[in-house]
């Protein structure tokens, strides 16, 4: 099923931000089957449980990809599946979402802790703030933020919190190093959630994979320019299949 790509969304905003990209990819290659799968709905932030759910739900021998948290989970699942995964692509996915000593270019821990507390107190207000950060760096940040938040499912805090806690726990560096299939990782130069410097850090960690930086774009670049992103993905897929 080398003509099938599974895309996983980011935290809190549902599948709608990925739909324009999926349509653009299909427009470029009618033989490519693009499937957007929602994140698991679990009351646990245990990484293994999330991966077990995804592994049981998603088909084998496909390309795995995702945006932000979805890309982090796709990375872990690709490493788990090994040769049962055709390849991996991530969009605005930091190997470590929260910064720490060995990975300084992430969200400051105190900022993340405030997010976590805010989500516990009022998840809808926190989601709006998250939407604004996703739209930071866009040509029309307010319009993009409204689009992101308006398309988000009405998710209770009990479902949002485990995903947010998962963001803080995940460190995909070992998974990315272990996965031997082709990889493409795209970052944004004006991202308000994933510092642009993470792109060069990842390239230093994985010098043999493709890492791209879209200079004038924010975290939701897949929604800002779905056709441009689709073109980069299609070129990557074509190159890998051609090899």
Regions inferred by a protein language model and the residue ranges of each:
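Conserved HGGG/HGGXW glycine-rich cap/lid loop of the alpha/beta-hydrolase fold
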Residues: 1-47
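Gly/Ala-rich beta-loop-alpha elbow adjacent to hydrolase catalytic centers
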Residues: 66-70, 74
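Conserved alpha/beta-hydrolase catalytic His-Asp/Glu region
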Residues: 120-170, 174-175
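Catalytic histidine-centered segment of alpha/beta-hydrolase-like enzymes
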Residues: 217-230
């Amino acid at each position: 099923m080398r003509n099938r790509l599974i895309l996983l969304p980011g935290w809190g905003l549902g599948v709608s931000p990925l739909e324009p990209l999926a349509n653009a990819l299909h427009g470029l290659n009618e033989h490519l089957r693009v499937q957007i799968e929602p994140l698991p709905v679990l009351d646990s932030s245990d990484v293994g449980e999330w991966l077990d759910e995804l592994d049981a739900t998603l088909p084998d021998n496909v390309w795995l990809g995702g945006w932000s948290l979805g890309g982090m989970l796709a990375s872990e699942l690709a490493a788990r599946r090994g040769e049962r995964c055709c390849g991996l692509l991530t969009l605005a996915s930091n190997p470590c979402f929260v910064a720490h000593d060995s990975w300084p270019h992430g969200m400051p821990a105190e900022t993340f802790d405030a997010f976590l507390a805010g989500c516990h107190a009022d998840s809808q207000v926190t989601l709006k703030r998250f939407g604004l950060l996703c739209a930071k760096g866009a040509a029309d940040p307010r319009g993009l933020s409204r689009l992101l938040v308006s398309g988000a499912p009405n998710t209770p805090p009990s479902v949002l919190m485990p995903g947010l806690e998962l963001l803080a726990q995940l460190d995909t560096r070992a998974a990315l190093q272990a996965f031997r299939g082709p990889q493409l990782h795209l970052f944004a130069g004006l991202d308000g959630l994933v510092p642009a410097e993470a792109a060069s850090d990842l390239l230093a960690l994985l010098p043999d994979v493709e890492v791209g930086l879209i200079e004038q774009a924010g975290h939701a670049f897949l929604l800002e320019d779905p056709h441009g992103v689709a073109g980069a993905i299609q070129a990557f897929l074509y190159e890998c299949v051609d090899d």
